[in-house]
Regions:
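Catalytic glycan-binding domains that act on GlcNAc-containing polysaccharides
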Residues: 18-107
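Sec-dependent N-terminal signal peptides
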Residues: 3-16
Length: 107
């Protein structure tokens, strides 16, 4: 299970600048297959943790989601999410949930 957490943490800081509409869904489906997890388990978790209604009306999980102290924020791209997150990390804050699956930075 730890490997799944690490995989999703690294996916949360995925090197693309802009998130694609289905990036989180693609990643969750991939790792459900690799680890023989129940179908749609990770997709369900990601929708609950980082779900966002987008312009075309779809409800998707969003990779550039940051949550601190129960206040979730959705960013347009990686750079904005990292800038926001790094400001708090430099101040010593570590209890920050990041990305599709909202993996906690502290752990």
């Amino acid at each position: 299970m730890k490997i799944i957490i690490y995989i999703f943490f690294f996916y949360s800081i995925y090197p693309l600048a802009f998130a694609g509409k289905y990036d989180c869904i693609i990643a969750t489906k991939k790792y459900e297959l690799i680890y023989n997890l129940p179908k749609n388990l990770l997709i369900s978790v990601s929708l609950v943790e980082s779900g966002k209604k987008i312009k075309d009306g779809d409800f998707i999980s969003w990779p550039w989601t940051i949550n601190m102290g129960g206040k979730g924020k959705f960013f347009d791209n990686k750079e904005k999410a990292l800038e926001y997150t790094n400001n708090f990390i430099f101040k010593g804050k570590k209890n920050i949930d990041i990305g599709c699956m909202q993996i906690n930075y502290m752990y």
